[in-house]
Amino acid sequence: VLKGKSMPSQEIILAITRQESEFDPKANSYAGAKGMMQLMTYTAKLVAKQMDVTYSKRKLTSDPEYNINLGTYYFNSLLNDYAEVYPFAIAAYNAGPKRVRQWRRLNGDPSKNKIDYVNWIELIKFEETRNYVQRVLENMNVYKYMLSQKPVKLEKFFN
């Protein structure tokens, strides 16, 4: 379904999926998010319509590929909305675009040089979202390294 489209890197999707569900296809959150990428049913319905695929609540937790395709498409739309600024898109994936708009207004906007990105992340009002953004960015770099399949040179850690 996603072939031929410019999509986010494998590393960021792995990082989000790890943080959302630890790769559990049957994951259900207390808030109602479902599947590996923890999609809310409203969001999943909207994205399925945008992708021109049939929405299936059951498939959110029974078909990992379906869930990942919807989640990837949604995250890609957030990346496009935020001009490829990962902290904004990641925060929006977790807390919603409305909250990111609020935080950019209240805390300053790093894309307009009003504050740097690290401080912007630290000022995210919700501890869960603040930690989420930090963990996803960390995980993304771990997966980037893992997927490059370059051997770890341990001596650099001991100099």
Regions found by a protein language model. Give the residues of each.
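Catalytic glycan-binding domains that act on GlcNAc-containing polysaccharides
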Residues: V1-N159
